[in-house]
């Protein structure tokens, strides 16, 4: 399995450098859990300028939705990233309702997914932005997210008549055990979401396609303006000079947290509302909890499951030259 993955990455790189016609990814399987259903993308009517925002989860999804929304819509104040950028593969919302909302959008659409590449219908016409983050930061953020679910949020997933797989629960353990479970099984206890390593490597293998851009949480934190300009260039969006201060302000965590606290849905689904959903937006909270050996174990697992360049990027955000 691992050898095949690495070979696929090398082959994609070789083809890209040779200037050959891209070999577009093909869907080969479905992923269906209590949370997501990949079949909801089957037959999706793509537009030529669609944007798909892709993450494993808790890696900066909503932040990137906010950034893309500011760029696409011209830096409006008070937009709801979740409202303007639906999560198509999320099971609880009726598919016809989501598709109808997308069809009615007159602007360039930006759609969210958490699916692995081999479970997603891929369009050569769309542009894909993949966001990554250090696995340890993802685990800490996922724990906080899952612990904040209200009873209504849990019922939204668990009471579906066609629910697939285990029920969604709050974390059944402390964050340290949660981390150990992730390293052992590559999933989150009580929150079946698929495997991070497979998800990241699969998308990494197609990073050389002309319609795929990789963005890292660390880079956004260290130099948000530079990364937003890189995203704008990739999306071929020209931004007026006077809009930049407003875009940067409205993509800050303080702004997004304050805006989220005004969204009634956040209070319904997260204890503490938008403040819980966005929490701190910081990295490295695990450093005060884990031992050096426990910290290093994540790197050891990544080295086994990922190619070296992919493992380095996921941890640091450094792309190969």
What are these regions (language model features)?
Residues 2-4, 11-215, 225, 261, ...:
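PAPS-dependent sulfotransferase catalytic domain
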Residues 69, 229-232, 248, 299:
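Amphipathic alpha-helical interaction motifs in eukaryotic regulatory proteins
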Residues 72-74, 224-239:
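Non-catalytic, well-ordered alpha-helical segments in soluble enzyme domains
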Residues 78, 236-246, 256, 310-313:
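Short, surface-exposed acidic
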Residues 81-87, 242-249:
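A generic structural motif
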Residues 172, 176-184, 232-237, 243, ...:
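Conserved C-terminal subdomain of P-loop nucleotide-binding cores
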Residues 220:
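Conserved FAD/dinucleotide-binding core of flavoprotein oxidoreductases
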Residues 249-273:
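Short acidic/His-enriched helical or mixed secondary-structure segments at domain edges of catalytic enzymes
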């Amino acid at each position: 399995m691992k050898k095949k993955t690495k070979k696929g990455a090398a082959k994609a790189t070789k083809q890209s450098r040779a200037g050959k016609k891209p070999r577009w990814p093909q869907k080969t399987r479905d992923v269906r859990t209590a949370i997501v259903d990949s079949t909801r993308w089957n037959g999706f009517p793509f537009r030529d300028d669609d944007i798909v925002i892709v993450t494993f989860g808790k890696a900066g999804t909503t932040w990137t939705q906010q950034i893309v929304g500011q760029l696409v819509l011209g830096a409006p104040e008070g937009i709801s990233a979740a409202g303007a950028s639906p999560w198509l593969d999320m099971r609880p919302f009726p598919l016809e309702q989501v598709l109808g909302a997308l069809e009615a959008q007159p602007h360039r659409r930006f759609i969210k997914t958490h699916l692995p590449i081999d479970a997603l219908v891929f369009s050569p016409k769309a542009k894909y932005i993949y966001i990554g983050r250090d696995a340890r930061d993802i685990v800490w953020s996922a724990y906080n997210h899952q612990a904040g679910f209200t009873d209504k949020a849990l019922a939204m997933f668990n009471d579906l008549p066609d629910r697939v797989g285990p029920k969604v629960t709050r974390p059944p353990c402390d964050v340290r055990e949660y981390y150990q479970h992730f390293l052992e099984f590559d999933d989150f206890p009580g929150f079946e979401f698929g495997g991070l390593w497979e998800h990241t490597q699969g998308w990494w293998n197609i990073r050389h396609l002309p319609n795929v851009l990789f963005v890292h949480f660390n880079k956004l934190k260290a130099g948000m303006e530079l990364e937003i300009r890189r995203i704008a260039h990739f999306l071929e969006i020209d931004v007026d000079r006077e809009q930049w201060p407003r875009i940067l302000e409205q993509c800050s965590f303080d702004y997004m947290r304050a805006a989220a606290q005004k969204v009634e849905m956040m209070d319904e689904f997260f204890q503490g509302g938008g403040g819980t959903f966005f929490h701190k937006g910081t990295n490295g909270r695990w450093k005060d909890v884990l031992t050096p050996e426990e910290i290093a174990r994540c790197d050891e697992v990544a080295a086994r499951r990922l190619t070296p360049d992919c493992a380095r990027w996921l941890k640091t955000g450094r792309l190969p030259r």
